[in-house]
Amino acid sequence: HRSQWVGFDGAPVTQTLSFNKPLKTDEFAFGGAIAHDKIGPTNSFNISMDGAYRLNLGHGRERTKLSFGLKGSISRYQTNLTSVDVVDKGDESFLRNENGSWLPNVGAGAFLYGRTYFLGVSAPKLLTNKLVNRSSSLFEYMQGREERTYYMTAGKVWKIRRQLSFYPAVLVKATKNAPLSGGAFLNFIVMTEFKIGAYYNFKEVAGAIAQWQVSKKLRLGYTLEMPVTSLFGTNLGSHEIMLNYSIKKGRTAIIYPKYF
């Protein structure tokens, strides 16, 4: 769960539930997610399914693997215009709600990783769907478009002492007609059970991360971030909580410690 710009009227709120599971051959894996976003009067729902094929590239300490993934998803955008506080209460543009159609999309990515490093590239939505109002039979107008976005990420874990590791990572995001954005993450892993760190998204936000590996199966996390833009001081920051649970079935081993 993520609450952004707490105290700001109409601030974004996001809930996500996801899962992933390797198959018996260990070469194939699948997963899925359900996500809900609310920003002002707009709600969006997304359902996705993922499949991945993994290649073993090494059997040494790193146990390097290369994973190729495909994603299929459907999204729907709804706008509750009647909830908007307007000056002219009789404005016909705000007297109806808009229910968009379900929009299909596909994505792809690749992920190279070992026990202590990773490098990934992805494009979760390759189709540039138009967001069109279909609540009126008299006309349709384009509200926006799902632009194609590319992500690149990389990270590495260095052991400093027996119970202390340093884990930096970077993320770069590129979207058509939008400035290139990215962030840097500096994390420390203590006793393999606790991860604390900070991050900075260029000209956007700065934040702090804390995670606790309660057991081999359960991990809890909390993130606090503050804007470094003109929004600073207008809200109580953004807060995110995370719960991750690994289900062991039969003799399947749980990798521990697992950095990412």
Regions found by a protein language model. Name each.
Residues 1-260:
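Subset of outer-membrane beta-barrel
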